[in-house]
Amino acid sequence: MRDNKVSPKPFFFASPERREVFPAKTKEKITRKESREHLARFNLACELVKVIRHFFPELLSLLKRVEDPRHQSYIIYSNHVLLMTRILSSIFYINSMRSTSGEFNDETVIENIGVLCGEELRELPYWETINNYLKRFSSDELQKVVCRLVYRLIRSRAFEDARLRGKYWQIIIDGTQLYRSRKDLGEHSLFCRKKKGTEEEYTEYYYYVLEAKVVLHEKIQVSILTEFIENEKREVDKQDCEQEGAKRLMERLKEEFPMLQICICGDSLYASEGFFKECRRKKWKYILRYKEGSIPSINQEYQVLKRREKNRVEEPEGVYDYVTGVDYRGESINVIEYESAKEKKKFLL
């Protein structure tokens, strides 16, 4: 184990189908510590297979059903082998496909991946083969697989305790910047002017992506949908933005999970009349981190009402105050203010 990350080769050191735990062809004595480490590697390989087969028994069949863009007469590796190899490289924290070819170039690794894929493999696909395949591969196909796997997790009832009030699944919407460069990243990239009006003015280009993640446990958040924030072309009057991307993401979420009881969680960026109406139209609940200044009228009314209603409660973990039914253009907003005793921080929701 390196830097608290499982090293890929030891993780797949022994096949779960094998009876022997230790190498048969060795004349060297191993220490007790090495014995424990080797046994741990064997157990980890077995546990990975168990997790996949228990929680995601459909994974292999779903990967087999994705549309293959290649000419079927000229392929050597099935699409599910290519995809499974790439998925495993991510699980093992391998940062590049070139490194994957080196790390996975081992008879036992090849055998184990073959077990997962249901095929007898002599070799694994080279990194260039996988990259060329992914360039032609539609990301929408993989998105369908992700949604299906998440749907199974939700239906399994293994994470029922994660529901708010025993009913609503928390879906966190959050944005992440992927790249930033002074070099033009393409016509779809976003851009901003830095040091505007000075001799040092320059343009910075970047990509931004929104993720919708379902909370299954306080330490487990699983991505459901991905939405890129990007311009249709370089010359635009108004650039794409996170709020518009969130609208598209919410529409897709409703299409994929029309009956799911959802509580959307996000930051103050989404606090707007349009967002509130969208949630009401979709029959969703929402919890937003509120910052003073995003909608001043809400904070002003809250400050007046909390002095009048006196709902303040003090507990060892912290102090909280709340006001229900704050009106904002016909929307009834509940505001909660919480101050953690441990962190000495205030939060407005």
Predicted feature locations:
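An anionic, glycine-rich sequence signature occurring as long contiguous blocks
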Residues: 285-349
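DNA-recognition alpha helix
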Residues: 97-118
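Charged, often Cys/His-bearing segments associated with DNA-binding zinc-finger transcription factors
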Residues: 1-57
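Basic, short loop/linker segments at the boundary and entry of helix-turn-helix/winged-helix-like folds
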Residues: 52-84, 119, 128-131
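Active-site-proximal, Lys/Arg-enriched surface segment
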Residues: 131-218
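Electropositive, glycine- and tryptophan-enriched low-complexity nucleic-acid-binding patches
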Residues: 194-261
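Short, conserved catalytic/metal-binding motifs centered on acidic residues
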Residues: 85, 100-101, 126, 130, ...
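Domain-level cores of phosphate- or acyl-group-handling catalytic modules
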Residues: 236-298
